[in-house]
Amino acid sequence: MIEFRNVTKTYDTGTKAVKNANFLIEKGEFCFLVGTSGSGKSTLIKLILKEEEPTSGNIIINGKDTTFLKPNRVPYLRRSMGVVFQDFRLLPDKTVYDNVAYAMYIVRATQRHIRRQVPMVLSLVGLSQKAKMYPHELSGGEQQRVALARALVNNPSMLIAD
């Protein structure tokens, strides 16, 4: 599902965020990546999402080498992933419902499917009663659950949390 083959990421400053990473995460596996602050955990996620390019090595996602993936194909790669970012990346001027629905709008889901799916995932994360609230009205834990609901709403093949 996710494979790194001799992946190195060196930033323009000369900082090596990732050095010769080799690993394979197969379908159905649950993987934790732990390390100190600045050890490259977020960089690995950015590499998986193609927000960053490796300096060397190959990254294989769902059996496809992303090394030569054209920029216009990156959104399709990302659709197979649900991502909860460290900073949640919620839209401050949108309700909880709309923050979750936004992930479905992007993939052009029908309004009918959105109306059915969003309440279901909000219930799953215990936020049904908060659907009309805005991010600033929620606790940090509730904001995190909105981000989780948004990551799950399109039934991704993998869930990545930073």
PLM feature segments, named:
Residues 49:
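Helix-to-loop junction immediately C-terminal to a conserved catalytic motif
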Residues 57-65:
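Conserved ABC transporter NBD signature motif
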Residues 97-105, 115, 119:
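Short helical segment in ABC ATPase nucleotide-binding domains corresponding to the A-loop/adjacent helical element
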Residues 134-138, 142:
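Conserved ABC ATPase signature
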Residues 148:
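Hydrophobic anchor residue at the start of the ABC signature
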Residues 153-157:
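A short, proline-enriched helix->beta-strand linker immediately N-terminal to the Walker B motif
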Residues 159-162:
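Catalytic Walker B motif of ABC-type/P-loop ATPase nucleotide-binding domains
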